Structures are given as structure tokens and as C-alpha cells.
A protein has these predicted regions:
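Membrane-proximal alpha-helical signals and transmembrane carboxylates
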Residues: 2-398
């Protein structure tokens, strides 16, 4: 029997491996994807037009480079009868179909106030490539123009707004961050109400050298393909747009937004100013627990707005003995002033929601769960007919 030659077999395997590697190299670059196919949409703005819908997509396009500066951000606009039609127009302009799997931000322009927002957003709930996690917001003016803004901080409008609406910002109670999934659940509940951040742009014509350096640094990791000149922009996201049955119902101001977030979100890093005996105290709150509930009483509904926290004085509008500061004890009068301040904020919020007939606190949904008979009796009138009760408690950290 002929002896099996292992050396010859190894040589054959080696030759086959070299041939296969050469084939991959000369035909497919080892499976590397064409750089044009890696362009992704990171943010999208939607405006309503006379002809239908205008979608402005902010696209991150990788570019070959020797020094690592390899991403350019461009804005591409498409207009059609629906969002899907508008995205198809973007396909015609760019040569690739805009999949939204990496889209992190959706902005509705001011023109969307005149429509049911869920008719506008229908595509995003149907599309297989779209997650339900993109943050959604409404802006003043045009969403397309906002996305093309020249930024003072950050590479692009999408990146800057994403920071402002991050989970950390949400925990400060200053912004009402929500995503597609959250507004869908809220709108199609018994309360039929939802909300989202309202963005305002503010021009900064006299940018400091540091700000200009920040803007230039944005071109290292990414260069905006928007306008070259014009004023720098910064964004304010401290107001909230509210919706009833998918229709725009109004805007909550900064204090009402703050109160809404204290009741709806898990918050920390919270600061509340109050006045006691003519002196302004800024209270730092931790271990915050807030919520809105509803119960039946005497054949009617009572809305209960509850909040509790541990308090320390973060700042005082006068000089104080450092020894008293180190003790960390908050005077009883200051605690009561803080509670009164919070009750005032909650009352302002409840009054604004009642006036707009927008149950953003989900009182109807909660009453439906816990007292179905009373809900059926008050259906559509839970917010307007409910009495209001507060349970606000602050205690000193020291």
C-alpha cells in the first residue's frame, strides 16, 4: 500500500488557500462594502407642504481620507404625497434607498400642527427598517431648515439636539424626552394624549473664539454639508408640545414642562428655587418620587399629584456662616417654601392641561384600570371634572 504523503497534502492545501485569498482580493476586496452603501440617515425632519410632505434627511457619508477625517454630513430633501414618496425622491437623488435603521432623531416642523401627527408618522410605524426608539420632537419654523443649521456646539443639528434630549438631560426634568414607541402608546390609550419636546433655535451672531474652535472641530469627525455662512445656532428644548388625539393642543412653558417631568419621569440632579423671608434659596433635590394618580370620591374623581424628595440647600442669595452650611440642615421654613413652590408649579401644569383638554398625566387611563364604572360615567370628562389634591413632601438631608 502506497504511503500517504503529508508534506504533499500540506503543499496542496497551502496552494489552494493562496488561490482563494487572491480570488477574494481581486473580486470583492475581502468583502468590504462599497463606501457609498454605508451612508446612513442619522436624523430626519418632516414638514407639510401644499403638495404633501417634505422630508429632509441628514445623512452621514463616510469619505476616504488619510488622516481619519472621514465623515461628511449632508442634508438631502425629498417631497412627495407621503413620507414614503418623499424618501423615494431622496433615493433618486442619492442613488441609495434611505433605510432608517440608524435614524436617532425625528423632528416635526411647525406646519405639522395642522395635521394628525400619526398620519404623518404612519410610515415609521410600518417600515421594517425603522426602530421605535428614535427621539421625536416638534420645532418652531421649518424642520428642514433646522437640520441644515450651522451649529455652535456639535457637528450637526442632529448631534446637538440628541445631546440636549439625552437620558441624562431627561433626568434633570428640564426636557420631555420621548420616542416613537412612547407617544404611540400614550396616544392610543384611554387618555388619547401625548407630548414631545418643543425646540426653538436661537442665533448666536457673535461667536467666541472657543465656539469657533468647537465648530471647526466638528469637521474633524464630521463636516456639515450645510450652509457655509450665517449665524451660529443654539437650541432650546425646555418647552413641551402637547397633543390630544394626535392633534396639536398647545405648548407648555418651561415651568410647566419642569412640573410635568417631575411627575412623569424618574429624575435626579433637580434644582428648585424658592423664596423664604425675602431670600432666594436654590434647593437641590434627590431621591425624588413623583406621580399623578386618580381615585374615586363621592361619586367623582380626584386627581392626586404627589411628590417627595430629600433636600439640601445648593445656593442662597446671601452670605452665610460656613459652619451652618457644613451642617446641611435645611430650615423648616425653607422646606415649606419649597413645597409651596412645587404646588404652584403642579397647579400651573394641571390648569394648562385642563384648558387644552389634554390628559398628558394619563388620568383617564389610570381611572379605566382601577374604577371601570366611574371611567365609563366620566368618559371624555375625567380631566375637566376631576378635583385636585396635592401631596408634596420635602425633608432635609441633614
Amino acid at each position: 500500500m502506497k504511503k500517504f504523503d503529508l508534506k504533499r497534502l500540506a503543499a496542496i492545501i497551502y496552494a489552494l488557500a493562496i488561490t482563494a485569498m487572491a480570488f477574494l482580493f481581486f473580486t470583492n476586496d475581502f468583502g468590504l462594502v462599497d463606501i457609498r452603501k454605508t451612508a446612513v440617515i442619522i436624523g430626519a425632519g418632516i414638514d407639510l407642504t401644499e403638495g404633501g410632505v417634505s422630508v429632509t434627511a441628514q445623512v452621514a457619508v463616510p469619505q476616504p481620507s488619510e488622516n481619519g477625517e472621514n465623515t461628511v454630513y449632508i442634508e438631502v430633501e425629498g417631497e412627495g404625497a407621503t413620507v414614503a414618496d418623499a424618501l423615494n425622491v431622496i433615493n433618486k437623488k442619492t442613488g441609495f434607498f434611505p433605510k432608517l435603521v440608524f435614524c436617532k432623531l425625528l423632528i416635526l416642523g411647525e406646519s405639522c400642527r395642522n395635521a394628525d401627527i400619526f398620519e404623518v408618522l404612519d410610515y415609521f410605524y410600518r417600515d421594517d427598517y425603522t426602530q421605535l426608539t428614535p427621539v421625536i420632537a416638534m420645532c418652531s419654523g421649518s424642520a428642514g431648515e433646522l437640520l441644515a443649521s450651522k451649529m455652535r456646539f456639535g457637528n450637526t443639528a442632529t448631534v446637538s439636539i440628541e445631546r440636549l434630549l439625552s437620558d441624562e438631560a431627561k433626568k434633570s426634568a428640564n426636557v420631555s424626552t420621548v420616542n416613537l414607541k412612547m407617544i404611540g402608546i400614550d396616544n392610543f390609550s384611554q387618555s388619547a394624549a401625548c407630548y414631545m419636546p418643543y425646540i426653538r433655535a436661537r442665533a448666536q451672531s457673535a461667536a467666541s473664539p472657543a465656539a469657533q474652535s468647537t465648530g471647526g472641530g466638528g469637521q474633524s469627525g464630521g463636516q456639515s454639508g450645510g450652509e457655509e455662512g450665517g449665524d451660529m445656532q443654539e437650541f432650546l428644548c425646555d418647552r413641551t408640545a402637547i397633543f390630544r388625539g394626535g392633534r396639536f393642543a398647545g405648548i407648555l412653558d418651561e415651568e410647566q414642562t419642569f412640573a410635568l417631568n417631575l411627575l412623569k419621569n424618574s429624575v435626579r440632579h433637580v434644582f428648585v428655587p424658592c423664596t423664604y423671608e425675602g431670600t432666594v434659596y436654590t434647593l437641590g433635590l434627590r431621591n425624588c418620587r413623583g406621580g399623578a394618580g386618580v381615585r374615586s370620591s363621592g361619586g367623582g374623581a380626584v386627581a392626586r399629584l404627589a411628590f417627595s424628595a430629600v433636600v439640601q440647600v445648593s445656593d442662597v442669595g446671601r452670605a452665610e456662616d460656613p459652619r451652618s452650611v457644613s451642617e446641611g440642615v435645611v430650615p423648616e421654613g425653607v422646606l415649606r417654601a419649597g413645597e409651596a413652590r412645587l404646588r404652584g408649579l403642579f397647579f400651573s401644569l394641571f390648569s394648562a392641561l385642563r384648558e387644552a383638554d389634554c390628559d398628558a398625566l394619563e388620568l383617564g387611563t389610570k381611572l379605566f384600570r382601577y374604577d371601570r364604572a366611574l371611567y365609563e360615567e366620566l368618559e371624555g370628562r375625567v380631566l375637566s371634572s376631576a378635583q385636585l389634591a396635592f401631596e408634596v413632601s420635602l425633608r432635609s438631608a441633614g
